[in-house]
Amino acid sequence: AYIRQVEELFSAARTAFKHLEYYYFHNCLYEGVWKNNHRRWTEQTPTTEVMNTYGKDYRCIFVGDASMSPYEIEYPGGANEHYNTESGRTWLERAITKWPNYLWINPTTKEHWEYTHSTHIIKEIFEDRMVPLTLNGLKEGMRHLS
């Protein structure tokens, strides 16, 4: 639902960053990501490959509504589209350890975050570095990334 909005965000962000790469994931980060959402099943990139390609000096920005079953974050086998051998939390923690300048941008309004348990879990993992997709939210997010 947010793909076009996020594509516009990253199109605008290209002018702010020297090097910008983006990958898609569904709900939570797991062992594979993809560059083209229409080819998500046929052209996945291993998450470990992405982590080995970009150094710790890169900024890592996740964009998503963080709304999913808590099982998708907390348990192996919790993903709703495939069997994940490691929890989403494990992958998210690896990512934020790899890239200490990280951020989660949430396109849903901040008022709705309190109604979704998974949003609270992601905010906790991200040490409250979750901002709304608003001008003020993006300004706050840039402070987290610097």
Where do the language-model regions lie?
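Acidic, low-complexity intrinsically disordered regions
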Residues: A1-S146
